[in-house]
Amino acid sequence: MLDIKFVRENPDIVKENIRKKFQNAKLPLVDEAIALDAQRRQAINEGEALKAERNKLSKANGPLFGRLKKCADEAEKAEIQKQIDANNAAVKANADRMALLEEQKAQAEAALNKIMLVIPQIIDETVPIGPDDSCNVEVERFGEPKTPDFEVPYHTDIMERFDGIDLDAAGRVSGSGFYYLLGDIARLHEAVLAYARDFMIDKGFTYCIPPFMIHGNVVEGVMSQTDMDGMMYKIEGEDLYLIGTSEHSMIGRVIDQIIPEDKLPQTLTSYSPCFRKEKGSHGIEERGIYRIHQFEKQEMIVVCKPEDSRDWYEKLWRFSVELFRNFDIPVRQLECCSGDLADLKVKSCDIEAWSPRQQK
């Protein structure tokens, strides 16, 4: 999320960024966040002042107790005791007020955090402006799309000819959006994953198998609430979610951690099964394995200094293109427009592979 200090000092920039992402309903949240931050800081400042006063009063009682112990004059003793009692009463009043301020601070922080989670990151100045993916911009093509002079069979038809897939059994066992892979098709699936793994290792990346379930606070750190509700499966009765991509647990690994500069960059390639609620919505494509609830993926993760992030961004998408081209698959790079960017992203591109059967 954005730093509240940045939001407080640059409200106009934050609001303009929200407009660029066509999320005008979020504009009032900027002022709400600033107001909550002011409440939070006021509670902190007053609490610190009261704490200092409490310490001063408590310290003042020490000499008074010493005088009280040595004093023989009853009138003077009564006066000293009166001062001690007054100090104790003030300390108690301070403690009560500090407890109230702590509660107010906690409430303001909780409300502020909820808002900050939905205020989008400031997008890169090179991101094209548009409301949705129809405004994504094609940047470059790699390889020439080929149109065969014969009708290309549907992918599941090919797999069924080799007895390599069983969608009916998967439907009975798990419902739509699942499949069994069998025999050589299953082996081919594993071979492609292994190739992608070794491809990234050869680029100097460290192979990692992460946890496949993560806590809710980690989910909040890697995706918006809307994306979370639309994608993640929650484990009933547990503070655990099945990951939608290993990116979730890999980024979670470094959340709130301080990494020495000499340990950067960290270049990791991670394998995991991925679990998502999404369902097919493209007619005949629903009977295939395009949009499914469970699949496996090889991911690229780089943890680096902010000033190096642009260079690594360029390297990562070029690695993706190179991998596809090694299979002689034509691809194109699409620059995601502002409205298509997830709120946590500053810049992103899609690498789309050519489908001879779909002709797109």
Predicted features and spans:
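N-terminal alpha-helical targeting/anchoring segments
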Residues: M1-P145, E160, G164
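TRNA-recognition modules of translation machinery and tRNA-sensing kinases, especially anticodon-binding
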Residues: L27, R141-K360
